[in-house]
Amino acid sequence: IWGWADPGTWVTVRFNGAYYEAQTGEDGKWMVTMPPQPAGGPYLMEVNEISIRDVLVGDVWLCSGQSNQETPIQRLVEMFPEINVSNNNMIRHYKVPTQEIREEVQEEIAGDAKWISGVASEVMNWTALAYFYALEAYQNTGVPQGMLVSSLGGSEIESWISQEYLKDFPRLILDKEALAAQAEASKDKGEGIWNLPDIDDSDWGTMEMPGT
């Protein structure tokens, strides 16, 4: 368990009948390490005056990929109507917000994302693959399941590799200024001949719209 506070602050973590203490360093960071805990919950965790309720202890899975991993569960409701009445508080889902970072790993995740449960009021915010995996795993083990989803449809593998390792492949290294110029140029679509008020379109043919 880790976090931030003013430098030199003593932090007490109370969980499952035990106490753990740590003092922040000059950078304001603190961390406590707990021994393995029995699977179950929900539990209450207290960090100084902060209370964190509905905490589960169980298995946590990292789910990553492209659109197949990111597909929202609401697209599957027609095929699996039981999703609408999901009532499982022992499975949890966290979707990492998409954030463009070009140079270094970030310590904090952008946005206001949070853990959500598998109850009907929250399940429509899940990704589909994570939901069915968590449900199957919980039904077979009885252990709470946490699905940490870090995915982005259509992303290339290079997007998931640090610059340190990409340096071994010079053909993948792009000049920052050239990349920025390319991105800016892509926004300029131009006027286009078709947009001129005096263009003669009398010889343009007709076409049927797909699906009509």
Indicate residue ranges for each PLM-predicted region.
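Cell-envelope and extracellular/periplasmic
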Residues: 1-212
